[in-house]
Amino acid sequence: MHVTREPASFHGGKVTTLEASPAGVVLNATGSAIPLLTFRNFSLRCDKSDPKVSFQTPWNWDVIQGKKIAVITSNSYLRYQLIVGLAGLVPPVSGNFFGDCVISWPVAGEGGLDGRLRISHGLDFLSTVYNDCIEQSKVSLDEFWELLSGMEIYPNLIIKELSGSQKDFFFLALSVLFAFDFYLIPKTKYLMSKAAKPLRMLLLRQLEDKSLISTSTNNRFLREFCTDGLVLGSQGEILFSGGLSESLEWADRNLEQSKTSESDENLFEVDLKLTNLDASSDVNDDF
Protein backbone atom coordinates (compact mmCIF):
# COMPACT_ATOMS: atom_id res chain seq x y z
CA MET A 1 0.00 0.00 0.00
CA HIS A 2 1.54 3.31 -1.09
CA VAL A 3 0.55 6.24 1.09
CA THR A 4 1.26 9.58 -0.54
CA ARG A 5 1.82 12.74 1.44
CA GLU A 6 -0.78 15.42 0.87
CA PRO A 7 -0.60 19.13 1.74
CA ALA A 8 -1.85 19.76 5.26
CA SER A 9 -1.64 22.35 7.99
CA PHE A 10 -1.26 19.68 10.67
CA HIS A 11 2.00 19.97 12.60
CA GLY A 12 1.61 16.97 14.87
CA GLY A 13 4.15 15.76 17.38
CA LYS A 14 6.34 12.72 17.33
CA VAL A 15 5.70 10.10 19.97
CA THR A 16 8.56 10.12 22.46
CA THR A 17 9.10 9.53 26.17
CA LEU A 18 7.61 12.60 27.80
CA GLU A 19 6.61 13.70 31.23
CA ALA A 20 3.30 12.31 32.39
CA SER A 21 0.30 14.46 33.15
CA PRO A 22 -1.29 14.26 36.62
CA ALA A 23 -3.64 11.63 35.21
CA GLY A 24 -0.68 9.50 34.15
CA VAL A 25 -1.14 10.17 30.45
CA VAL A 26 1.95 10.73 28.35
CA LEU A 27 1.49 13.81 26.22
CA ASN A 28 2.68 14.44 22.67
CA ALA A 29 5.24 17.14 21.94
CA THR A 30 5.98 18.84 18.66
CA GLY A 31 9.09 17.70 16.83
CA SER A 32 11.02 19.07 13.88
CA ALA A 33 11.86 15.69 12.33
CA ILE A 34 10.07 14.86 9.10
CA PRO A 35 7.41 12.23 9.85
CA LEU A 36 7.17 9.00 7.88
CA LEU A 37 3.49 8.62 8.70
CA THR A 38 1.01 11.13 10.13
CA PHE A 39 -2.29 10.39 11.87
CA ARG A 40 -4.77 13.27 11.67
CA ASN A 41 -8.07 13.11 13.57
CA PHE A 42 -7.73 9.35 13.10
CA SER A 43 -10.19 7.00 14.78
CA LEU A 44 -10.99 3.30 14.50
CA ARG A 45 -13.75 1.04 15.72
CA CYS A 46 -12.91 -0.49 19.12
CA ASP A 47 -15.75 -2.89 19.88
CA LYS A 48 -16.63 -5.89 17.73
CA SER A 49 -20.22 -5.98 19.01
CA ASP A 50 -20.91 -2.24 18.76
CA PRO A 51 -19.84 -0.30 15.63
CA LYS A 52 -20.57 3.01 17.38
CA VAL A 53 -17.69 2.56 19.85
CA SER A 54 -14.56 4.23 18.46
CA PHE A 55 -11.53 6.17 19.72
CA GLN A 56 -12.25 8.26 22.78
CA THR A 57 -9.78 10.86 21.48
CA PRO A 58 -8.78 10.82 17.79
CA TRP A 59 -5.07 10.44 17.05
CA ASN A 60 -2.97 13.41 15.94
CA TRP A 61 0.66 12.33 15.96
CA ASP A 62 3.54 11.28 13.73
CA VAL A 63 5.69 8.20 13.31
CA ILE A 64 9.29 9.23 12.70
CA GLN A 65 11.44 7.17 10.34
CA GLY A 66 13.23 4.31 12.06
CA LYS A 67 10.69 3.93 14.88
CA LYS A 68 9.74 0.32 15.61
CA ILE A 69 6.63 0.53 17.75
CA ALA A 70 4.99 -2.20 19.81
CA VAL A 71 1.31 -1.42 20.38
CA ILE A 72 0.34 -2.70 23.84
CA THR A 73 -3.34 -2.94 24.74
CA SER A 74 -5.74 -5.36 26.42
CA ASN A 75 -8.28 -4.79 23.61
CA SER A 76 -7.61 -7.57 21.09
CA TYR A 77 -10.20 -6.20 18.65
CA LEU A 78 -8.44 -2.83 18.65
CA ARG A 79 -5.16 -4.55 17.80
CA TYR A 80 -6.90 -6.26 14.91
CA GLN A 81 -8.55 -3.07 13.66
CA LEU A 82 -5.28 -1.15 13.78
CA ILE A 83 -3.52 -3.60 11.48
CA VAL A 84 -6.34 -3.96 8.96
CA GLY A 85 -6.92 -0.21 9.07
CA LEU A 86 -3.29 0.64 8.29
CA ALA A 87 -3.28 -2.06 5.60
CA GLY A 88 -6.18 -0.27 3.91
CA LEU A 89 -8.59 -3.18 4.41
CA VAL A 90 -11.07 -1.08 6.38
CA PRO A 91 -11.69 2.67 6.38
CA PRO A 92 -11.19 4.65 9.60
CA VAL A 93 -14.24 5.80 11.49
CA SER A 94 -12.91 9.35 11.11
CA GLY A 95 -9.84 11.21 9.90
CA ASN A 96 -7.01 9.68 7.91
CA PHE A 97 -3.32 8.82 7.84
CA PHE A 98 -0.80 9.81 5.20
CA GLY A 99 2.89 9.88 4.48
CA ASP A 100 5.50 9.48 1.76
CA CYS A 101 6.02 5.76 2.28
CA VAL A 102 5.07 2.28 1.12
CA ILE A 103 3.27 0.26 3.79
CA SER A 104 3.54 -3.53 3.73
CA TRP A 105 0.64 -5.90 3.71
CA PRO A 106 0.48 -7.63 7.15
CA VAL A 107 3.73 -9.59 7.41
CA ALA A 108 3.17 -13.34 6.90
CA GLY A 109 -0.18 -12.57 5.28
CA GLU A 110 -1.10 -13.62 1.76
CA GLY A 111 -0.49 -10.28 0.09
CA GLY A 112 -3.77 -10.47 -1.80
CA LEU A 113 -2.58 -13.38 -3.95
CA ASP A 114 -5.10 -15.78 -5.48
CA GLY A 115 -4.41 -19.31 -4.27
CA ARG A 116 -4.84 -20.61 -7.81
CA LEU A 117 -1.69 -18.84 -8.97
CA ARG A 118 1.62 -20.60 -9.37
CA ILE A 119 4.39 -19.46 -7.03
CA SER A 120 6.29 -17.79 -9.89
CA HIS A 121 3.20 -15.96 -11.17
CA GLY A 122 2.36 -14.65 -7.70
CA LEU A 123 5.89 -13.32 -7.27
CA ASP A 124 5.81 -11.73 -10.74
CA PHE A 125 2.55 -9.97 -9.88
CA LEU A 126 3.77 -8.55 -6.58
CA SER A 127 7.12 -7.60 -8.11
CA THR A 128 5.27 -5.51 -10.69
CA VAL A 129 3.12 -3.80 -8.07
CA TYR A 130 6.03 -3.23 -5.66
CA ASN A 131 8.84 -2.82 -8.19
CA ASP A 132 10.78 -0.24 -6.13
CA CYS A 133 10.59 -2.47 -3.06
CA ILE A 134 12.20 -5.33 -4.98
CA GLU A 135 14.92 -3.14 -6.46
CA GLN A 136 15.84 -1.74 -3.02
CA SER A 137 15.61 -5.08 -1.20
CA LYS A 138 18.48 -6.27 0.98
CA VAL A 139 17.37 -9.83 0.29
CA SER A 140 18.30 -11.27 -3.10
CA LEU A 141 16.04 -13.41 -5.24
CA ASP A 142 18.69 -16.12 -5.12
CA GLU A 143 18.41 -16.17 -1.30
CA PHE A 144 14.63 -16.25 -1.59
CA TRP A 145 14.51 -19.20 -3.98
CA GLU A 146 17.21 -21.10 -2.10
CA LEU A 147 15.22 -20.88 1.14
CA LEU A 148 12.02 -21.94 -0.63
CA SER A 149 13.73 -24.93 -2.24
CA GLY A 150 14.81 -26.06 1.23
CA MET A 151 11.10 -26.42 2.01
CA GLU A 152 10.46 -28.11 -1.36
CA ILE A 153 8.63 -25.04 -2.61
CA TYR A 154 9.27 -24.56 -6.31
CA PRO A 155 8.24 -21.87 -8.85
CA ASN A 156 5.79 -24.09 -10.74
CA LEU A 157 3.78 -25.16 -7.68
CA ILE A 158 0.26 -23.80 -7.16
CA ILE A 159 -0.12 -21.80 -3.96
CA LYS A 160 -3.28 -23.46 -2.67
CA GLU A 161 -1.72 -26.91 -3.10
CA LEU A 162 1.11 -26.20 -0.66
CA SER A 163 0.98 -27.92 2.72
CA GLY A 164 0.20 -25.85 5.80
CA SER A 165 3.84 -25.56 6.85
CA GLN A 166 4.87 -24.69 3.29
CA LYS A 167 2.26 -21.93 3.13
CA ASP A 168 3.45 -20.48 6.43
CA PHE A 169 7.03 -20.42 5.16
CA PHE A 170 6.17 -19.12 1.69
CA PHE A 171 4.01 -16.20 2.82
CA LEU A 172 6.53 -15.13 5.46
CA ALA A 173 9.36 -15.38 2.91
CA LEU A 174 7.34 -13.30 0.47
CA SER A 175 6.83 -10.58 3.09
CA VAL A 176 10.54 -10.57 3.91
CA LEU A 177 11.63 -10.29 0.26
CA PHE A 178 10.19 -6.80 -0.28
CA ALA A 179 11.85 -3.69 1.22
CA PHE A 180 8.88 -1.69 2.47
CA ASP A 181 9.24 1.64 4.25
CA PHE A 182 6.77 0.69 6.95
CA TYR A 183 5.98 -2.83 8.13
CA LEU A 184 2.79 -4.10 9.76
CA ILE A 185 3.45 -7.14 11.94
CA PRO A 186 0.40 -8.70 13.66
CA LYS A 187 1.28 -12.40 13.82
CA THR A 188 4.60 -13.61 15.19
CA LYS A 189 3.99 -17.16 16.39
CA TYR A 190 5.43 -18.71 13.22
CA LEU A 191 7.98 -15.92 12.75
CA MET A 192 9.51 -16.75 16.14
CA SER A 193 9.48 -20.50 15.54
CA LYS A 194 12.58 -22.60 14.90
CA ALA A 195 11.46 -23.29 11.32
CA ALA A 196 11.38 -19.57 10.53
CA LYS A 197 14.80 -18.67 11.98
CA PRO A 198 16.44 -18.07 8.54
CA LEU A 199 13.58 -15.74 7.58
CA ARG A 200 13.76 -13.98 10.93
CA MET A 201 17.40 -13.13 10.28
CA LEU A 202 16.55 -11.76 6.83
CA LEU A 203 13.69 -9.68 8.24
CA LEU A 204 16.05 -8.12 10.78
CA ARG A 205 18.38 -7.24 7.91
CA GLN A 206 15.52 -5.73 5.91
CA LEU A 207 14.34 -3.68 8.90
CA GLU A 208 17.68 -2.02 9.69
CA ASP A 209 16.60 1.48 8.64
CA LYS A 210 12.85 0.91 8.38
CA SER A 211 9.82 1.48 10.62
CA LEU A 212 7.21 -0.89 11.93
CA ILE A 213 4.09 -1.18 14.03
CA SER A 214 3.42 -4.51 15.69
CA THR A 215 0.43 -5.71 17.69
CA SER A 216 2.14 -8.97 18.68
CA THR A 217 1.85 -10.15 22.28
CA ASN A 218 5.07 -12.18 22.05
CA ASN A 219 7.57 -10.49 24.37
CA ARG A 220 10.53 -12.27 22.77
CA PHE A 221 9.57 -10.84 19.40
CA LEU A 222 8.98 -7.37 20.85
CA ARG A 223 12.39 -7.26 22.53
CA GLU A 224 14.14 -8.48 19.39
CA PHE A 225 12.37 -6.30 16.82
CA CYS A 226 10.88 -3.24 18.55
CA THR A 227 12.48 -0.13 20.03
CA ASP A 228 9.46 1.75 21.36
CA GLY A 229 6.15 1.02 23.03
CA LEU A 230 2.72 2.63 22.78
CA VAL A 231 0.25 1.65 25.50
CA LEU A 232 -3.39 2.11 24.53
CA GLY A 233 -6.59 2.05 26.53
CA SER A 234 -9.62 0.09 25.38
CA GLN A 235 -10.85 3.00 23.25
CA GLY A 236 -7.55 3.92 21.63
CA GLU A 237 -6.50 6.50 24.21
CA ILE A 238 -2.72 6.86 24.48
CA LEU A 239 -1.86 6.03 28.09
CA PHE A 240 1.92 5.85 27.79
CA SER A 241 4.66 6.00 25.16
CA GLY A 242 8.38 5.52 25.48
CA GLY A 243 11.12 2.94 25.22
CA LEU A 244 9.99 -0.65 24.86
CA SER A 245 11.11 -1.88 28.28
CA GLU A 246 9.55 0.98 30.21
CA SER A 247 6.34 0.69 28.16
CA LEU A 248 6.05 -3.03 28.94
CA GLU A 249 6.73 -2.35 32.62
CA TRP A 250 4.16 0.46 32.69
CA ALA A 251 1.56 -1.80 31.05
CA ASP A 252 2.27 -4.61 33.52
CA ARG A 253 1.73 -2.22 36.43
CA ASN A 254 -1.22 -0.25 35.12
CA LEU A 255 -3.02 -1.96 32.24
CA GLU A 256 -5.66 -4.45 33.25
CA GLN A 257 -5.18 -7.85 31.61
CA SER A 258 -2.19 -6.58 29.66
CA LYS A 259 -0.59 -10.04 29.58
CA THR A 260 -2.46 -11.59 26.69
CA SER A 261 -2.13 -14.94 25.02
CA GLU A 262 -0.86 -15.53 21.50
CA SER A 263 -4.25 -17.13 20.87
CA ASP A 264 -5.27 -13.56 20.04
CA GLU A 265 -3.44 -14.12 16.76
CA ASN A 266 -6.28 -16.42 15.76
CA LEU A 267 -8.21 -13.24 15.06
CA PHE A 268 -6.26 -13.11 11.82
CA GLU A 269 -7.26 -16.63 10.79
CA VAL A 270 -11.05 -16.46 10.96
CA ASP A 271 -13.86 -14.49 9.37
CA LEU A 272 -14.31 -11.17 11.14
CA LYS A 273 -16.29 -8.11 10.24
CA LEU A 274 -13.58 -5.88 8.77
CA THR A 275 -15.81 -2.92 8.07
CA ASN A 276 -16.36 -0.06 10.48
CA LEU A 277 -19.91 0.31 9.21
CA ASP A 278 -22.88 -1.40 10.83
CA ALA A 279 -24.57 -2.94 7.82
CA SER A 280 -21.96 -4.62 5.71
CA SER A 281 -21.11 -8.23 5.00
CA ASP A 282 -18.24 -10.18 6.46
CA VAL A 283 -15.01 -10.33 4.53
CA ASN A 284 -12.63 -13.28 4.64
CA ASP A 285 -9.50 -12.09 6.37
CA ASP A 286 -6.71 -13.73 4.43
CA PHE A 287 -4.76 -10.53 3.70
Regions found by a protein language model. Give the residues of each.
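ABC ATPase nucleotide-binding domain signature region
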Residues: 38, 65-131
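A short, flexible loop at the N-terminus of ABC-type nucleotide-binding domains that lies
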Residues: 2-6, 10-62, 70
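Glycine-rich phosphate-binding loops of nucleotide-dependent enzymes
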Residues: 38, 44-62, 68-74, 83-86, ...
